[in-house]
């Protein structure tokens, strides 16, 4: 019997030209494609913040996507990840865009 890996959670903040370029919509779509849950929102400081939850391999893929790709018109200058932790179970059921 193979033991299922505990999901992980990580918070992120993306800097650069990430507002007004559909960054949240593309982030939600990529999170859904990878089977992740969490959320994404714009900040008053012009950044995008959020949380990723799911299998560590998929979370790592999403971290690379946030650093290297983003939405087609975005210009990412920096991404900060913090508060990484293992979870007994997922805390979200979907990947949502917060207003």
From Swiss-Prot:
Record has Hydrolase as a keyword: yes
EC number(s) given by UniProt: 3.6.1.7
UniProt key word Repeat: no
GO molecular function, a single term: acylphosphatase activity
Family membership: Belongs to the acylphosphatase family.
InterPro entries: Acylphosphatase, Acylphosphatase-like_dom, Acylphosphatase-like_dom_sf, Acylphosphatase_CS
Residues annotated as catalytic: 24, 42
Acylphosphatase-like domain sequence ranges: 9-99
Catalysed transformations (reactions): an acyl phosphate + H2O = a carboxylate + phosphate + H(+)
Full protein name: Acylphosphatase-1
Entry keywords, A to Z: Hydrolase
Source taxonomy: Eukaryota, Metazoa, Chordata, Craniata, Vertebrata
């Amino acid at each position: 019997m193979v033991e299922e890996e505990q999901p992980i959670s990580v918070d992120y903040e993306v800097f650069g030209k990430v507002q007004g370029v559909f960054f949240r919509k593309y982030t939600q779509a990529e999170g859904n494609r990878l089977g992740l849950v969490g959320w994404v929102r714009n900040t008053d400081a012009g950044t995008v913040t959020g949380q990723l939850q799911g299998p560590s391999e998929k979370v790592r893929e999403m971290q690379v996507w946030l650093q290297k790709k983003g939405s087609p018109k975005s210009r990412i200058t920096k991404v900060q990840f913090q508060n990484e932790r293992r979870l007994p179970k997922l805390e979200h059921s979907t990947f949502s865009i917060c207003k």
